[in-house]
Amino acid sequence: MLKFLNQVTSYGKESFQAARYIGQGLAVTFDHMKRRPITVQYPYEKLIPSERFRGRIHFEFDKCISCEVCVRVCPINLPVVDWEFNKEIKKKQLKHYSIDFGVCIFCANCVEYCPTNCLSVTEEYELSTFDRHELNFDNVAMGRLPYKVTQDPMVTPIREFAYLPESEMDGHNVDHTAPRAGQTPAEIVASTPKPETKEG
């Protein structure tokens, strides 16, 4: 009889402990349900990159003087500059320029040190392909106009990377319907003062 009572008591303790652990897990789950979502419904929603975001490098063929400064400052000597010397004008003439974005570390040293500003960083970060050889961009591919998230009519731009309102450190107490920090592109345009036109 005593053995049976001990078994019942131990079973009751284990059941109570299991129920307590399940309750703790559900409490964490319900706590997360109150929080605002941090996921983005990509590709229908996209985050607006920050002001100094370093994405795909844009190249302007006509500005390049084939000085190869970009190759010297690159930590991995990545840019390929193919040029020939024109004896008539006694200057280098660029024939071909390419960067392999599958190897590029996006440090933007080439952009910073370029003497003619023929290189610039864009906010493009979608460089995925099925074949890694397609990431080797030549001067034609690098010369196309950069893509902007805010100018795509098929995409909803999300305000920014920060999801909490200003001066708020803990996300537990913030209502999930509260506005995000920062401004939307439309609000930025509306708050920008228009240039004054001279009449007369």
UniProtKB/Swiss-Prot annotation:
Keyword annotations of the record: 4Fe-4S, Iron, Iron-sulfur, Membrane, Metal-binding, NAD, NADP, Plastoquinone, Quinone, Repeat, Thylakoid, Translocase
UniProt: [4Fe-4S] cluster 2 binding residues: 74, 104, 107, 110
Molecular-function GO terms, alphabetical: 4 iron, 4 sulfur cluster binding; iron ion binding; NADH dehydrogenase (ubiquinone) activity; quinone binding
Membrane-crossing residue ranges in chain numbering: none
Record carries keyword rRNA processing: no
InterPro entries referenced in this protein's UniProt entry, alphabetically: 4Fe4S_Fe-S-bd, 4Fe4S_Fe_S_CS, NADH_quinone_OxRdtase_chainI, NDHI
Compartment(s): Cellular thylakoid membrane
Uppermost EC category: translocase
Catalytic activity as recorded in UniProt: a plastoquinone + NADH + (n+1) H(+)(in) = a plastoquinol + NAD(+) + n H(+)(out); a plastoquinone + NADPH + (n+1) H(+)(in) = a plastoquinol + NADP(+) + n H(+)(out)
Any one annotated GO CC term: plasma membrane-derived thylakoid membrane
Cofactor info, note text: Binds 2 [4Fe-4S] clusters per subunit.
Cofactor(s), names only, from the UniProt record: [4Fe-4S] cluster
Domain 4Fe-4S ferredoxin-type: 55-84, 95-124
GO biological process assignments: photosynthesis, light reaction
UniProt superkingdom: Bacteria
Keyword Transit peptide: no
Record SUPFAM superfamilies: 4Fe-4S ferredoxins
Chain segments carrying region Disordered: 175-200
Residues that coordinate or bind [4Fe-4S] cluster 1: 64, 67, 70, 114
Enzyme Commission number, as recorded: 7.1.1.-
Role noted for this protein: NDH-1 shuttles electrons from an unknown electron donor, via FMN and iron-sulfur (Fe-S) centers, to quinones in the respiratory and/or the photosynthetic chain. The immediate electron acceptor for the enzyme in this species is believed to be plastoquinone. Couples the redox reaction to proton translocation, and thus conserves the redox energy in a proton gradient.
Subunit details: NDH-1 is composed of at least 11 different subunits.
Family of this protein: Belongs to the complex I 23 kDa subunit family.
NCBIfam families: ndhI, NuoI, PRK05888.1-3
Record protein name field: NAD(P)H-quinone oxidoreductase subunit I
Species name: Acaryochloris marina (strain MBIC 11017)
Gene label: ndhI
